[in-house]
Amino acid sequence: MECHNQQSSQPPTTTHCSGGETNCYEKRWHDHRGTIIERGCGCPTVKPGVKLNCCTTDKCNN
């Protein structure tokens, strides 16, 4: 699985996930800096108020 891993509005970068991971994720939340976007491998548990999108194809989380 290959997932995007850049933060917020940085230029796109990708990583090859280890351990047979089959999901990519995108988390979004707001703070004093504005909208923060985090991308990576897996499908993490998030706190209330954080939007989470998990997907199962290469580079699906951009």
From Swiss-Prot:
Domain of life per record: Eukaryota
Disulphides: 3-24, 17-41, 43-54, 55-60
GO cellular component terms, semicolon-separated: extracellular region
Reported tissue expression: Expressed by the venom gland.
Annotated localization: Secreted
Keyword Secreted: yes
UniProt keyword Secreted, yes or no: yes
Cross-referenced InterPro entries: Snake_3FTx (IPR003571), Snake_toxin-like_sf (IPR045860), Snake_toxin_con_site (IPR018354), Toxin_cobra-type (IPR054131)
GO molecular function: acetylcholine receptor inhibitor activity; ion channel regulator activity; toxin activity
Family per similarity comment: Belongs to the three-finger toxin family. Short-chain subfamily. Type I alpha-neurotoxin sub-subfamily.
The name this protein goes by in its record: Short neurotoxin 1
Organism the protein comes from: Naja christyi (Christy's water cobra)
